[in-house]
Amino acid sequence: MKALVLEEKGKLSLRDFDIPGGAGSGELGPKDVRIRTHTVGICGSDVHYYTHGKIGHFVVNAPMVLGHEASGTVIETGSDVTHLKIGDRVCMEPGIPDPTSRASKLGIYNVDPAVRFWATPPIHGCLTPEVIHPAAFTYKLPDNVSFAEGAMVEPFAIGMQAALRARIQPGDIAVVTGAGPIGMMVALAALAGGCAKVIVADLAQPKLDIIAAYDGIETINIRERNLAEAVSAATDGWGCDIVFECSGAAPAILGMAKLARPGGAIVLVGMPVDPVPVDIVGLQAKELRVETVFRYANVYDRAVALIASGKVDLKPLISATIPFEDSIAGFDRAVEARETDVKLQIVMPQ
């Protein structure tokens, strides 16, 4: 099958590619479904593998198919699958854990060391015409949720995970540092989770303008205003209940404690490329609770339900739809990191 293949750092190709034992090739297991891929989002991790050839200790040592934010249509079901049928429109959770692991038994399968996650070396991704996937990690899309929205469930699930880790109370005020795609997802999940107001801070005014179109969102351009002073003014000097750090930027991480109220929460979502300093005393002096986020667990069905309900509208965050045959150009556009782009999506031939 033709696939978008990362041959090596900085080199992509569209070519026939055999994926041994999975992602569309091989035999269908009794608990699997075969899916005709429809829409695949371009994620920052895909782009990072393209430009750097690695993320942390995950290194691309051999050609790898990219893509993990996906939706499609079921075209075959395994003999034991009962909740899905041929023709169902679905989205797919891309990380498959070992169900017998201690992490999975604890319900934290996202941190299972044995998890097999699409487009994370050595596991191939889903930018192929068909994939085989466990039915247990495949979710039917309601009729009012499009394929494009279905492919947005994966990044929104990270926002859902962050909102759950924050333990939001109704009426909380939150700050999100970083208005990239994940920062925007976190902001919308925080609103859906009960926050009365979410303040989003970034350097890029075009991104702030996009997220500011949502009710309940206020924005601060930190090129123009001091963030700590602005948050203090917005909260009568008390500070926000929750800080979601989504930029991974060292200055933002160092300044987190100044934004939070005493007894508030810090949720670390963004991933710094290198180790960064943290103001431990600043955290201690306010007895701030610190939470971390790595992917997600047990939130996909909730994410789909929120989108279907209309309480979360992700369509304005889709900046462009790119045909599969132009996907290399799409990735090159993603590398440009245009300030007006949030999510680029690739549509597969049908």
UniProtKB/Swiss-Prot annotation:
Species of origin = Agrobacterium fabrum (strain C58 / ATCC 33970) (Agrobacterium tumefaciens (strain C58))
Essential cofactor(s): Zn(2+)
Keyword Cytoplasm in the entry? The reply is no
How are cofactors bound according to the entry's free-text note?
Answer: Binds 1 zinc ion per subunit.
Question: Superkingdom of the source?
Answer: Bacteria
Q: What is this protein called?
A: Putative D-xylulose reductase
Arranged from A to Z, the UniProt key words for this protein are: Metal-binding, NAD, Oxidoreductase, Zinc
Cited SUPFAM superfamilies? GroES-like, NAD(P)-binding Rossmann-fold domains
Indicate the secretion signal residues.
none
Family annotation (InterPro entries): ADH-like_C, ADH-like_N, ADH_Zn_CS, GroES-like_sf, NAD(P)-bd_dom_sf, PKS_ER, SDH-like
Family according to the record: Belongs to the zinc-containing alcohol dehydrogenase family.
| Reaction catalysis annotation | xylitol + NAD(+) = D-xylulose + NADH + H(+)
Q: List the Gene Ontology MF annotations in alphabetical order.
A: D-xylulose reductase activity; zinc ion binding
Residue numbers binding Zn(2+)? C43, H68, E154
Q: What EC identifiers does the entry list? A: 1.1.1.9
Enzyme type, top EC level: oxidoreductase
